[in-house]
């Protein structure tokens, strides 16, 4: 996908608890939970507080870092400009998910994960308030899970993604060929896609993908052009304040019987390679771009997309029953998993 980033860390596992086989598959691809460590080809599930100390004392990944220039300043993404003009993703594996498309399609399936079905897709469609017969642009659509859900409501959907394998999956999974349309194209150059004309879309969405795309501005500018005046955009991403790959983790405070969310770095923008199969000497990687919240707000505004509504979504997954349930559930309810931004096309 161009590229969906999925963090299943909100289950708030108690230290040392072993997730299910399916959940481990998510963690191997999206290491947002620091309870998985590797030694050679062996995976060890260890208490989060121990893994946090190990993480602080061990160089676990290579990251290109830059501090934002000015508070609330330009894009917070200028450190990533080495990828342009725009460093076409088709020539740089890791900046789209075509090379892991088959695996991802099998993982997500026809209707998406539990988070997609119960939280994300209902939330996106509610925030867009899109009606039957209206036209939705699904930016970085992957294998079309949002498009299928929208089409079931009678919405015309056009999905765009650079990963050819995922576009093929979206076409094969279509439920309504008259309402669902999918195209392989770079979302940073939407004008180059012949199916996207200026001012024809009532709404647009970018779901669990924007943190894997750089730079931001061409994406927003293309969406602005494609939307009708007053058209809405909803962007959903792992919450950039609390869900930072390899820079955030849960820690259990034994003395006070509390679970804390630790954040080691936030304002620094980072390009973070993610190994899809940790523990192996070789294997595919994807790339995540952490940015502070100001980067999203400022670039959207600069493109003429004005944020009018924001929601912070918590995980719907309950922690395990036990003596720590109340504390773990409080952290689940207080620390959001996803950030949803709605912006309106000005003019």
Where are these regions (language model features)?
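Conserved class I S-adenosyl-L-methionine
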Residues: 55-72, 76-131, 145, 149, 233-273, ...
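Class I SAM-dependent methyltransferase SAM/SAH-binding core
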Residues: 135-139, 143-192
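A short acidic, Gly/Pro-enriched loop at the edge of an enzyme's catalytic core
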Residues: 193-204
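A short SAM/SAH-binding and catalytic strip from SAM-dependent methyltransferases
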Residues: 202-217
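A short glycine-rich, Lys/Arg-flanked "PGG" loop and its adjoining helix->strand segment in the class I
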Residues: 217-232
């Amino acid at each position: 996908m161009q590229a969906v980033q999925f963090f299943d860390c909100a289950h708030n596992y108690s230290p040392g608890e072993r997730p299910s086989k399916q959940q481990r598959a998510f963690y191997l691809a999206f290491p947002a939970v620091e309870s998985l460590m590797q030694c050679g080809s062996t995976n060890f599930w260890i208490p989060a507080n121990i893994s946090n100390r190990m993480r602080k004392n061990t160089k676990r990944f290579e990251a290109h870092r830059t501090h934002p220039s000015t508070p609330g300043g330009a894009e917070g993404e200028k450190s990533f400009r080495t990828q342009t003009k725009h460093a076409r993703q088709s020539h740089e594996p890791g900046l789209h998910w075509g090379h892991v498309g088959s695996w991802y399609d099998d993982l997500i399936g026809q209707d998406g994960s539990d988070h997609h079905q119960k939280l994300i897709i209902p939330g996106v469609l509610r925030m867009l308030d899109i009606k039957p017969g209206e036209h939705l642009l699904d930016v970085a659509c992957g294998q079309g899970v949002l498009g299928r859900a929208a089409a079931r409501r009678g919405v015309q959907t056009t999905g765009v993604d650079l990963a050819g394998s995922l576009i093929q999956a979206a076409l094969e999974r279509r439920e309504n060929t008259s309402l669902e349309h999918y195209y392989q194209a770079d979302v940073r150059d939407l004008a180059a896609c012949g199916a996207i004309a200026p001012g024809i879309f009532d709404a647009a969405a970018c779901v669990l993908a924007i943190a894997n795309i750089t730079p931001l501005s061409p994406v927003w500018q293309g969406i602005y052009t494609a939307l009708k005046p007053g058209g809405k955009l909803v962007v959903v991403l792992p919450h950039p304040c609390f869900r930072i790959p390899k820079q955030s983790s849960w820690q259990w405070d034994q003395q006070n019987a509390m679970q804390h969310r630790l954040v080691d770095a936030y304002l620094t923008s980072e390009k973070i390679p993610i190994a899809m199969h940790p523990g192996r000497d070789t294997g595919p990687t994807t790339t995540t771009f952490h940015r502070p919240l100001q980067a999203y707000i400022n670039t959207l505004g600069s493109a003429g997309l004005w944020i009018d509504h924001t929601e912070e979504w918590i995980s719907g997954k309950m922690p395990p029953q036990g003596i720590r349930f109340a504390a773990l559930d409080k952290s689940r309810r207080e620390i959001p998993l996803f950030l949803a931004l709605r912006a309106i096309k000005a003019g």
